[in-house]
Curated annotation (Swiss-Prot):
The lineage of its organism: Eukaryota, Fungi, Dikarya, Ascomycota, Pezizomycotina. It comes from Ajellomyces capsulatus (strain H143) (Darling's disease fungus). Transmembrane segments: none annotated. This is Fe-S cluster assembly protein DRE2. Residues 253-269 are annotated as: Fe-S binding site A. Residues 93-118 are annotated as: Disordered. GO terms for cellular component: mitochondrial intermembrane space. Residues 105-114 have a biased composition (Polar residues). The C-terminal domain binds 2 Fe-S clusters but is otherwise mostly in an intrinsically disordered conformation. The N-terminal domain has structural similarity with S-adenosyl-L-methionine-dependent methyltransferases, but does not bind S-adenosyl-L-methionine. It is required for correct assembly of the 2 Fe-S clusters. It comes from the Eukaryota.
Length: 351
């Protein structure tokens, strides 16, 4: 089977122990245009394939004259590398040159097992995912996409054409032979030279203009009336029955046993407002209770800081905490003279 383009032979590892079969395959191809690679070395990444090089990639059968071993080694990554090595319009063939996915004309093969059929079907799906297509003869072909071309999108074409038509129609009434008839102060129209075009005044390099009239493909206002798209009124989404339903508290907002109820972040069930109102009420009650305990500037109060029934025994009670014992009833009070009366005036200790 002689070929004119470059050919890549992919051999399973079992064929290396049968050199006579491998030599038979090599004799049918031009040696200077044929490359031979072992599938196991490709699968382990020991060798690489050049991109867009081969016109034909030929899968060889194993020692059992089937493609079972070849299909088992061709995983998705390896198939993609093989497809990338094909040139545009290149073909992927097998040794028997049979249509892919078919064992024979009746769909049966005496030498193939159930596992072989599954691998064959998997291989067929993978090569399609890799970008190959079937031609009229049932061969796998890499499509020639060709050079990609940028296609300009004409946005707001109808609106621009309408504005252009209106502009030309209005300018035809005023512009004649390159002049514009403008009314003078005495009521007589005087010709005024028309504005110079961009051909006479080219745009300086690096200067751009923004076209604010471009609607970027949005339909014009006149087309909105003819549009079949219906606008939804958000006020009609909920009726009175929906508004009157009881709000179901989410499980994460429910307090755990023995803990205070806390509102979650971005609370929408009303618990946050309820807790804030409760805290304000408690704060107002506490402030009101503190108001009754405040003393005026002219009011005096006598407070006995000593513990009832407890008397100091160290004799240093009036010297301060540094000299007092642990059980002293005057701990926390400043030093004082024995027998001096202690008074509180506006929360200041007066000795």
């Amino acid at each position: 089977m002689a070929t004119t383009g470059r050919v890549l032979l992919l051999s399973p590892p079992s064929l290396s122990s049968h050199p006579e079969k491998l030599n038979t395959v090599l004799k049918s191809h031009t040696r200077d245009k044929t490359d031979l690679q072992m599938l196991d070395r490709l699968a382990h990444g020991l060798v690489s394939l050049p991109e867009s090089t081969y016109d034909i990639v030929l899968l060889l059968t194993g020692a059992d004259n089937t493609l079972a071993e070849t299909h088992s080694l061709l995983n998705r990554e390896l198939i993609q590398r093989v497809v990338h090595s094909l040139r545009p319009a290149g073909k992927l063939r097998n040794r028997e040159n049979k249509p892919w996915g078919l064992s024979d004309g009746n769909g049966n093969n005496a030498n193939s097992s159930r596992r072989y059929n599954d691998d064959e079907q998997r291989f067929r799906n993978e090569v399609i995912l890799a970008g190959l297509v079937f031609d009229d003869k049932g061969e796998l072909l890499k499509p020639d996409i060709g050079a990609q071309q940028a296609i300009p999108l004409k946005l707001g074409r109808r609106r621009k054409e309408k504005e252009k038509t209106d502009t030309l129609a209005s300018s035809a009434n005023y512009i004649t032979n390159g002049t514009v008839d403008a009314p003078a102060s005495n009521g007589i129209s005087a010709p005024i030279p028309a504005a110079k075009t961009t051909e006479n005044n080219p745009v300086p390099p690096g200067v751009g203009f923004i076209d604010f009239s471009d609607d970027f493909g949005m339909p014009a206002e006149d087309d909105l009336e003819d549009s079949d798209e219906e606008l939804i009124d958000e006020d009609e989404l909920l009726d009175e029955d929906d508004m009157g339903r009881q709000i179901v508290q989410p499980p994460e907002c429910r307090p755990k046993p023995g803990k205070r109820r806390r509102a979650c972040k971005d609370c929408s069930c009303g618990l946050s407002q309820k807790l804030e109102a409760k805290d304000k009420a408690q704060r107002a009650t506490a402030d009101k209770a503190l108001e009754t305990m405040k003393l005026g500037s002219s009011e005096l109060a006598e407070v006995d800081f000593t513990v009832q029934g407890k008397v100091g025994s160290c004799g240093n009670c009036s010297l301060g905490d540094a000299f007092r014992c642990d059980g002293c009833p005057y701990i926390g009070l400043p030093a004082f003279k024995q027998g001096e009366e202690v008074r509180l005036l506006n929360n200041d200790v007066q000795l």
